[in-house]
Amino acid sequence: MTATLTVALPKGRLLEPALALFRHAGYEPAEPATTRKLLVPSSDGVLAFLFVKPADVAVYVESGAADAGIAGTDVLREAAADVLEPLALGFGACRMVVASPEETPFPSLPGGATPRVATKYPRLTRAFFAEMGLGVEIITVAGSVEVAPLLDLSHWIVDLVDTGRTLRENRLVERARILDVGAVVVVNRASHKLKLERHQELLKALQDAKTLGRKSAPGTTGDLAS
């Protein structure tokens, strides 16, 4: 049986709560999440689950390679993805913030020096500081952002925060909030028109699972950040 919808799911922190939601909605992957396969059908053959890096969900869905997916709003805003966002899922909640060592001034440096900002989100970071009227040097890193000020790579960082534990462990303090982040369902615009009934069925099942079963589904409070 050919799957009617291909759904891109992000590897990492969001995968467990995303799979729990789909299971509660009645879509069980035919193979365990530990499989090395990147494309796995649901047990009933209705869906095909595509496991990709979080930042790639928007790429696959926007291009039409996947009909739908689950993504954090952080990667969607960074990519400026042209996709539909019909359903917020209520997990993966955190915030994107500016942080720095307590002794490092913010929002300006002594002598008018240009601040260096380390981040995985260069577009959003640039836009935030441009709105403040502040010129900064963006240093794009793929991970371990919190260590950048400790090694004098940057003065400030922009990253995701939930409890703030990781900031405290690295002697950083939150300076400004850029945006609130959470997991959402994303849908390709053309696919939504061409496969409207299938998308409506899936969205209703996910909405019902979110509303009625989220408390009993394991891992549905998973976070994007710490």
Where are these regions (language model features)?
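Domain-level signature for soluble enzymes in the chorismate/prephenate branch of the shikimate pathway
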Residues: 1-226
